[in-house]
Amino acid sequence: MSGTILENLSGRKLSILVATLLLCQVLCFLLGGLYAPLPAGHVTVLGSLCREDHARQNDTGFLLYSRGAGACIPVTREEVEQDSTKMANELVHVFQMPLPRDLRDLDYSRWQQNLIGVLQVEFGYDSSSELREPPRELQLTIDMRLAYRNKGDPDNGWKLYAHGVEHRYLDCVTSHVGPTETLYSCDMIPLFELGALHHSFYLLNLRFPLDTPSQMNLQFGHMHDLTLTAIHQNGGFTQIWLLLKTMLFPFVVGIMIWFWRRVHLLQRSPALLEYMLIYLGAALTFLNLPLEYLSLVYEMPYMLLLSDIRQGIFYAMLLTFWLVFAGEHMLIQDAPNKSTIRSRYWKHLSAVVVGCISLFVFDICERGVQLRNPFYSIWTTPLGAKVAMTFIVLAGVSAAIYFLFLCYMIWKVFRNIGDKRTSLPSMSQARRLHYEGLIYRFKFLMLATLVCAALTVAGFIMGQMAEGQWDWNDNVAIQPTSAFLTGVYGMWNIYIFALLILYAPSHKQWPAMHHSDETTQSNENIVASAASEEIEFSHLPSDSNPSEISSLTSFTRKVAFD
């Protein structure tokens, strides 16, 4: 009997392996909790008002900036109010990022990876206006110009990055009612998203053109304060994240090579579960590959999209593996044919495939278009926001249903094995102890799978929420978000690493032993003694016994066929 390492490894060696992996898991949590800052940080910029020359309004290369030599002269709110036309089509709202601190200019680092801008609008109406209810879904037309410069460039060396005229829809509430005007504060609206933070400084010019024939922006009174919140990935978190990837990548590659070599040494073709393990390891290797180092040298605006695709491939493979893993251990197939994805699991996996394709299409519609136009967002229109929210809700519901279905499958596995344990008392003591040990080991592994699945779902949700956590208290000593994300990422690697070891074929060839004192045998000797009784299971109607990868599989199938 050969079987897997999970079955043949001694209790002492297995305890050492499990303890080592648990220690690595704790270190992954501590690495994120004690050394990594929050995944995302932010800077809030209050827009400066500048007046534009009429002759330069259509010149997209003309940029106004508020700091440095040649900066525009700021316009005060009182000057705007005193102007008879409120300086219509002359005002430019200027945002220069990042803000200086302690009289020292700061700059963005390429370690910060990406930049997202959201805008909060405040505008007012004269009290004589007929408007009484807060406006809903008002269409706002914005002329946006995004520029950049690097260290060493002159203060006026801004280069245009992107230009677009976009529409945004505002939902507002009354914030102040005065004798002369009523102020309205609106919900934040997405403004831009950069998949690469390659330059040191960024500049944003916003114009709100007025046009009577097309009724452009005429429904607004006059703009008051505009506040831009620029959200970026924290450089310290990126360094910890890449350090974790760099350390884990060679270990996973090495264990995959070792696993596949042991499989090919056997005189049989690989089983379905062995194929699934190597595919899962390949997906994890693709995710672990620290491609982000390239973004420190080259501008890669597609890095966000590529990261989403890599994580999507891993999620799809992990969800598929869990279904096959539980299904292969339910051991209820009646036919002797070899298990295949198409023959046994196409119904189970169809929902996973549809969900992954839907999320991929959604991601392409969002970040794929942003490669060409960083001001685009599917959330900008009421219909687009509803569609996007529907996708997210469906993804959450699907994840919950998947987890419940996985729990159901694992429960059936436990019940199936429990039913088969009724045959244990009829066996010899050596064989009974052997299979009882296998059952306990297998149950522990399945419970670990459930914990991994639950934390994966929670990690996915927290990953989506990470960008919204930038208003947390900066004085927190241990950041639970960073600890959780690094812990879950380490858990994926440790879990798959353990599976590749434990489900690798064992090459031990135990001789038949004849002895009377079985109670003094070690775990490995019990396995050897059980090997001498393997004739009980030699007539199973499977596709030749050498294709079995687990003696637990043989045990449950034998009792099922009996």
Curated annotation (Swiss-Prot):
What is the disulfide pattern of this chain?
none
Under InterPro entries, the record lists: WLS-like_TM, WLS_GOLD, Wntless
| Stretches of the chain found on the membrane's Cytoplasmic side | 1-13, 261-270, 333-344, 412-441, 504-562
**Membrane topology (Lumenal):** 35-239, 292-311, 366-390, 463-482
Where would you find this protein in the cell? Presynaptic cell membrane; Postsynaptic cell membrane; Cell membrane; Endoplasmic reticulum membrane
Question: MF terms per GO, please?
Answer: Wnt-protein binding
Q: Which GO terms describe its cellular component?
A: cell projection; endoplasmic reticulum membrane; endosome membrane; Golgi membrane; neuromuscular junction; plasma membrane; postsynaptic membrane; presynaptic membrane
Gene Ontology annotations of biological process type: imaginal disc-derived wing margin morphogenesis; intracellular protein transport; positive regulation of protein secretion; positive regulation of Wnt signaling pathway; regulation of intracellular protein transport; segment polarity determination; Wnt protein secretion; Wnt signaling pathway
Membrane topology category: Multi-pass membrane protein
Transmembrane regions: 14-34, 240-260, 271-291, 312-332, 345-365, 391-411, 442-462, 483-503
Major place of localization?
membrane
Q: How does it assemble?
A: Interacts with wg; in the Golgi. Interacts with Vps35, a component of the retromer complex; wls stability is regulated by Vps35.
Q: What does this protein do?
A: A segment polarity gene required for wingless (wg)-dependent patterning processes, acting in both wg-sending cells and wg-target cells. In non-neuronal cells wls directs wg secretion. The wls traffic loop encompasses the Golgi, the cell surface, an endocytic compartment and a retrograde route leading back to the Golgi, and involves clathrin-mediated endocytosis and the retromer complex (a conserved protein complex consisting of Vps35 and Vps26). In neuronal cells (the larval motorneuron NMJ), the wg signal moves across the synapse via the release of wls-containing exosome-like vesicles.
The family annotation for this protein states:
Belongs to the wntless family.
Query: Any idea what this protein is called?
Result: Protein wntless
What is the originating organism of this protein?
A: Drosophila sechellia
